[in-house]
């Protein structure tokens, strides 16, 4: 079933070019998906190069296992644990580049059975890995109204979070929701002001998906681990699709591109300053898709690619 889904990788060349591939380098594709980035990386590696791919989606793992290449290996798990995967392989400080393509993929959105989309009726699941954790339906049936409202406001930036949360809880008391169409209808009915350019359930589905998959915590942990695993000169190439993701990436790169913040006038010797360490990253800027790519793939419209390089500090 999954092979029927056409998937166009957003900012494909730009993200891989951002890694500045060395033929003998060791790279991580933290979000294998359907393998667009991984295949391009492999095409640029020599015989000594290595690529470690990660994904927590079983369908992505099935696709990855079709790649017969001794330079390639796949791990079924969250990219937040990349530090552990690298340590297990004795590669700490030896990784030449990490690529992350954040958020939900087109095949996940387009497969109604995964429950990510309000446009297609399916089980109200939304898990990146359907074998682990609570589904969206299970969480919405057991969560407090205040907690649902907080999630919708925090992760969906939903203006009517309290009203929608109340409607969800009331509906689940009457009859537990198990389908995406049911949730979309409840949200639409509870939304007093409609945006003619956006479905009223858009923010709610984004928020619940982010919460169910701990997406923002996953990003923060992966970024933190990247500083430890990257070799000097190693690159970070990260694509985000909404402001919450991009804010985390931007802040991380900005904070680690600065040297130690020492209060003005505080007496410190040169030796003490050295112990504080220097900046750990050099931000190399951001890229956004061009008009042609957006025309071919409208989902690319909101994407942002940020690139940074590990320093010697």
Swiss-Prot record:
NCBIfam families in alphabetical order: 16S rRNA (cytosine(1402)-N(4))-methyltransferase RsmH
Function: Specifically methylates the N4 position of cytidine in position 1402 (C1402) of 16S rRNA.
Name this polypeptide is given: Ribosomal RNA small subunit methyltransferase H
GO biological process, one term: rRNA base methylation
Keyword field: Cytoplasm, Methyltransferase, rRNA processing, S-adenosyl-L-methionine, Transferase
SUPFAM superfamilies: Putative methyltransferase TM0872, insert domain (SSF81799), S-adenosyl-L-methionine-dependent methyltransferases (SSF53335)
Catalytic activity: cytidine(1402) in 16S rRNA + S-adenosyl-L-methionine = N(4)-methylcytidine(1402) in 16S rRNA + S-adenosyl-L-homocysteine + H(+)
Statement: the UniProt record of this protein carries the keyword Cytoplasm: yes
Family: Belongs to the methyltransferase superfamily. RsmH family.
Sites where the protein binds S-adenosyl-L-methionine: 35-37, 55, 79, 101, 108
EC number: 2.1.1.199
Xref: Pfam families: Methyltransf_5
GO CC terms in record: cytoplasm
PANTHER family xrefs: 12S RRNA N4-METHYLCYTIDINE METHYLTRANSFERASE, S-ADENOSYL-METHYLTRANSFERASE MRAW
Taxonomic source organism: Shigella flexneri
Gene3D superfamilies, sorted: Putative methyltransferase TM0872, insert domain, Vaccinia Virus protein VP39
Domain of life of the organism encoding this protein: Bacteria
Subcellular location: Cytoplasm
Name of the coding gene: rsmH
Main location: cytoplasm
GO molecular function: rRNA (cytosine-N4-)-methyltransferase activity
């Amino acid at each position: 079933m999954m092979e029927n889904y056409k998937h166009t990788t957003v900012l494909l060349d730009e993200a891989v070019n951002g890694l500045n591939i060395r033929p003998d380098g060791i790279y991580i594709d933290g979000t294998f998906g359907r393998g667009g980035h991984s295949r391009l990386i492999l095409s640029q590696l020599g015989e000594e190069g290595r690529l470690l791919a990660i994904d927590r989606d079983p369908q992505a793992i099935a696709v990855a296992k079709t790649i017969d290449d001794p330079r390639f290996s796949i791990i079924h798990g969250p990219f937040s644990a990349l530090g552990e995967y690298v340590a297990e392989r004795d590669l700490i400080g030896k990784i030449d580049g990490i690529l992350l393509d954040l958020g939900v993929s087109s095949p996940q959105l387009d497969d109604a059975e995964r429950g990510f989309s309000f446009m297609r009726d399916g089980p109200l699941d939304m898990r990146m890995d359907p074998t682990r954790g609570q589904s969206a339906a299970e969480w919405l049936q057991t969560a407090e109204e205040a907690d649902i409202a907080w999630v919708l406001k925090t992760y969906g930036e939903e203006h009517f979070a309290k009203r929608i949360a109340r409607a969800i809880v009331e509906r689940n008391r009457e009859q537990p929701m198990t389908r995406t169409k049911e949730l979309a209808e409840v949200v639409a009915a509870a939304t007093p002001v409609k945006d003619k350019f956006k479905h009223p359930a858009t923010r709610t589905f984004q928020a619940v998906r982010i919460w169910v998959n701990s997406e923002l915590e996953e990003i923060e942990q992966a970024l933190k681990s990247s500083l430890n695993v990257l070799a000097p000169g190693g690159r970070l190439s990260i694509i985000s699709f909404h402001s919450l993701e991009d804010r985390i990436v931007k802040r991380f790169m900005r904070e680690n591109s600065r040297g130690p913040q020492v209060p003005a006038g505080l007496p410190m010797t040169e030796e003490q300053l050295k112990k504080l360490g220097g900046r750990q990253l050099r931000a190399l800027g951001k890229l956004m898709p061009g008009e042609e790519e957006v025309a071919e793939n409208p989902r690319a419209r909101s994407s942002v690619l940020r690139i940074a390089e590990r320093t010697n500090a």
